[in-house]
Amino acid sequence: MSKFLLILLTLCGLGAGPVMAWQDPAESGQEVVDSTAVPVRPDYVRLDSWAGRLNGWTPHILSDLAAILAEAPSHGLPGQERLAEALLDPAIPFAQRAELAGLAALRYAGWLEYGLMEAETHGVRGLYASEAGYLVSRLQDGLDAGDLWPVFAERLPQVRDYDILRAEMLRILALRPIWPEITPGGSLRVGDSGPRVDQLRARLTAERLLLADWQTGAPYDTRLETAVRRYQGRVNLSPTGRLDQPTLRQLNVSPEQRIAQLRANLEQRRWRTRDLGDRHIWVNLADFRLEAWENGRLAREHEVMIGGQASSTPEFTEEMQYIVLNPWWGLPAGSARSRFQSMRRNPSIVDQYGFRIFNASGDAISVYEIDWSRWGNYWPYRMSQPPGPTNPMGEVKFIFPNRHNVYIHDTVERDRFIRTRRDFSAGCIRVQDPLALAEWVLNGQDGWSRARIDDVVAGSSPTVVWLDQRIPVHIAYWTVVGDVDGRVRYLHDLYRRDGRVIADYAALHDAFSGQGLPFPSGLARAGNTVRR
């Protein structure tokens, strides 16, 4: 790589030195580091060794690439303004701009396809040889066709709300200079008036929940109350219609905070597999919601309960293999120990709930055979509960084997679905209207109509139904979501997982935006290194 291009890369954020003018880094005391070598994993490839294989650049394609790079902020990615300017600068020899374009295109395509940050370590996400080869092949196809736009469009995540979140990002970026704020104070309700009511109207107008036809000084009316209710629904608050303190805190979240949250959520979309499955189930834990999708269409929605903070439900993807109608419940160790204390005081509980107790050899024993003085607080037995009206599994469970031992199931506590916040389980996912979900899961499977499902459930025999076609189950934790109607909702960070993701992504985002070194020493805690 030429010294000229190294200097150009440094100036455009593809190099490591924070040189801010057209100046030889050696004269400025800066060391030119060829940061086209990507950090973190030794099996990540150098971008320059692959980008140099791209050919067919023309002034028109360079102009298109500059426009493509200019869209980076809408994707929550670092701004590429200086790169775009360099690509269009006639003072820079065309051959050098073409070489720069190859590096910029490959890096940006990698960001869109795989992300800027590693999902597990939060270090910089580089490219493996197979990934670089694939992207170079697709980029070369675009160069041969004289059009890079479709190539980059194909790199975008396939989750349905990605474009909705992009539109929200553009809206907030545009509003940032004039973001309305509400003066802190007491709650407001219908009939109140004053400057804070005007501020509330201005803020909800910015949220596109009110038309800008209201009069200054007008009292808090039912129209404003309706807008407040709609806003509260967006942020998962109880829809009281009053400006209470939780609602005020959400309304006064700064645009910078919202932008940081959106950037992290857009990045999380890039971490997800691109092939979700023609038929798949999507669970967003932060939204307490399950969605069943078929051929790109939302087929069903279900409310869910998830694990509490002490037993939080993990994020993962696995394939549903079978369902169980009238399932037994194998008590987890924690539940068994708590039941043990109750049974010690009142052994009749075992018969009341139909529990079965098994010793270490797997033999069933009677509760009256247990020598309580021998075991103290230790519980060496397994416990199971057969199907029935008190079985916490309810009428059906959906099994997608995984290392977390998490599955979806019915519940006997169905009245708790009316709550807004539903973190009541021990880690599994309890679903509302589970037999309707079972009907969808078994749709098209010979012999399994809703009528047959109901007939089986009306009995008491456990019945395992293996799926002819496995169904991917994706469990995510996303605190910003876009609904099918285009509405964006900001959700409560129940598990407090957002903070680290937002902070670590912001650090990388700022570094690659030219606000610091692309791989600064301050990020070494994430395992980053810079190699020549």
What are these regions, as identified by a protein language model?
Residues 6-15:
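Bacterial N-terminal signal peptides
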Residues 21-36, 126, 148-532:
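Well-ordered beta-sheet/strand-loop patches within structured domains
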Residues 1-4:
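Positively charged n-region of N-terminal signal peptides that target proteins for export
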